[in-house]
Regions:
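Short histidine-centered catalytic/ligand-binding loop motif
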Residues: 127-151, 202-210
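C-terminal helix-cap and adjacent tail motif
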Residues: 188-238
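Active-site helix/loop of acyl-thioester processing domains in fatty-acid/polyketide metabolism
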Residues: 146-162
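Active-site microenvironments that recognize anionic phosphate/pyrophosphate groups
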Residues: 6-124, 228-238
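A short glycine-rich, hydrophobically flanked beta-strand micro-motif that places a catalytic Asp/Glu
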Residues: 163-176
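Glycine- and small hydrophobic-enriched segments that form the cores of compact globular domains
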Residues: 101-115, 137, 141, 147-151, ...
């Protein structure tokens, strides 16, 4: 017989979204917000833990004098994201382009996916993977989801093969656009201060990488991806 915790999970899934037999209902946002605000001061500010992130050696800022902004009131609704309607999504232009090479930031594509390169930033390379068809991350068909996993592994290995890179950081947020998109940050080698979750913050302050250096990195990565996974290099990487 399955353990009780497994049975509770099974009843949760088998009785609709929140089954009657689930031993505790999921917390509402009102309850969550009230619990957060109960720990805030009179200005709505949360305290910074003495052993929190500002104590990490990878934190980009001096901790002295640092304070959090006040927690804002609950919004009535979340603002709609760009591309909620498929006909207004940026992916329409991707599919209608006569040649992928005409899309300036695109460096790789196959029948279902594309990879674009970000504007020059502080790290050696930032790439973005997205499906050509209009899907959010949680609505990808099984076939596309399986492809995504394979591309992510191959792309990560290609990025980590760059001589200036030790690791690839993978990020998915999705608050700005409704179309699925995943970011790949190249973390510089032998710079341990840039490791971990603060890399995206450091990226804003590091000097911009020259365009020709960025393009050379993108070209090496996409050619490696073509060799190990497939697809074709386009645009700056062709």
């Amino acid at each position: 017989m399955a353990p009780p915790t497994i049975l509770r999970r099974m009843s949760f899934r088998s009785n609709g979204r929140y089954g009657a037999r689930f031993d505790r209902m999921p917390e509402t946002i009102e309850d969550y917000y009230s619990r957060v605000m109960a720990t805030a001061d009179d200005e709505g500010r949360l305290a910074i833990p003495a052993d929190g992130i500002p104590c990490w050696e990878v934190f980009p800022f001096e901790a002295e004098g640092l304070r959090l902004r006040p927690i804002e009131p609950l919004a009535d609704v979340d603002e709609p994201r760009h591309g909620e309607a498929a006909t207004q999504c940026i992916c329409v232009g991707w599919r209608q382009a006569d040649e992928p090479n005409s899309i300036d930031d695109e460096v790789w594509r196959d029948d279902h996916w594309r990879i674009s390169v970000a504007e020059p930033s502080g790290v050696p390379l930032i790439l973005m993977l997205a499906p050509l068809a209009h899907h959010d991350f949680t609505t990808l068909p099984k076939e596309r989801a399986a492809e995504m996993g394979q591309i992510m592994v191959a792309l990560g290995a290609a990025i980590e093969a760059l001589p200036s890179v030790v690791r690839v950081h993978v990020s998915k947020w999705g608050d700005g656009g409704a179309h699925a998109h995943i970011f790949f940050f190249a973390r510089p080698i032998r710079m341990p201060q840039l490791r971990g979750t603060m890399l995206a913050v450091w990226d804003d302050f590091l000097p911009r990488i020259p365009v020709d250096v960025r393009d050379a990195n993108a070209r090496a990565v996409t050619q490696d991806l073509v060799r190990t996974y497939g697809g074709r290099a386009v645009g700056r990487a062709a």
